[in-house]
Amino acid sequence: MMLSISDQDLSLRRRQFLKIGGLGLGGLTLSQLLAVREAAGIGQLHSDRSVIFLFLHGGPSQTETFDPKPNAPAGIRSATGDISTSIPGLRFGATFPKLASRSHLFSIVRSFQTGDGNHDIKPIVGRDSGGANLGSIYARVAGTNHPVTGMPRNVALFPRAVAPDSQPENNNFGRFTSTGALGSAYAPFVPGAGGNAQADMQLMISRQRLDDRRNLLGELDRVKQAINVEGLAGNDRLNRQAFETIVGGVANAFDLSNENQKVIESYDTAPLVRPENISRKWRNYNNYVDNAQSLGKLLLLARRLCESGCGFVTVTTNFVWDMHSDVNNAGVEEGMQYMGLPLDHALSALIDDLESRGLRDKVMVVACGEMGRTPKINARGGRDHWGGLAPLLIYGGGLKMGQVIGESNADASRPAADPMNNQNLIATVMHQLMDVGQLRTVTGLPQDVMRAVTAAEPIPGLL
């Protein structure tokens, strides 16, 4: 149900409040919001940077992406071939021509290990994050909403955020909204059909009144005092985030129709892989379609949210990188046509957009999955699970770009130098989002937060 507020009368019925996407009223008053922010934010320990974490669920191949091993024997080297990049001597898999021409703008880690070949959602949620989404750790330090715009600090984007007819998010291998021991107040805000629907953030009220945040909150406070709110505390996170999003005047950030059409077209990955060109013999067909239809627009939406004050955006499509060549999934050569081309286009569009907007130092982009793939292609033309090495791309955030960090061995099965793991990646992300040195002096923070932030050193050469 959409909340309706007229310009003439801001009084709202209790029943209307209770049905706003299943929300109640907890956490509405300015004093309560400030108290929450003070308790959660603990001063200004966080930076003004944002992170877009693109999780490539299923486990992309290190060989067909950024470590093609062109001199290795057939069956080990990239099945899609390889191409030169803007960095002399550096080669990528052949389905990444756009990223190849921009390789000087980001860094690749060729010695990254996720630790095992299991399907889960590490490193975004896993043992090394204390069972919490990395964005939830950030929100525990920075607060759940931006104090000026009201934008949720921690957002998770699934295909339905931009493509309502797509499949629901896949939680079979872990929940991207997990918060570990931090509590549900710090869970990612989920727009679209999988969470608080975009329609639930639209108010029938003039822009002038919507932007008058103090007046609107005052009216809402008076309504709250007139009704019984004792039973609404369990929905405090949803209430606070949804209403702060509404009254902060940032609901438009979630609506791509407010974006310049040429910018939308520059991100759009749908024309690259048409549904009729994807084989229906794979059980993953619908997810392949959803990925192509949504990936570019998801990254565009992530950029819009970062500009409006979001600090951490998880972006993922549904489990499309598992290229065994079995009844569920295509092999690597066919699968990279479905997956590599949209990823190449979408990441390149995001990098170009951030560069043109002067956001290179303000927004960090991370792209990786839960594992890599076997160094040897199987008899069916697929690659199987492999935890010994995985691809990792990092852009922006004030880090040193245009680098290849670490080195893999001859068949891309293990690091040959400078091994990096999930803890190093998490430390790198957290050092960009918060003042880790100052954080060490703060008492009262959950051990899971401190452990995730301080368990390892950031990836050397980036800071």
Describe each region flagged by the PLM.
Residues M1-L463:
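Ligand-binding pockets and gating/stacking loops
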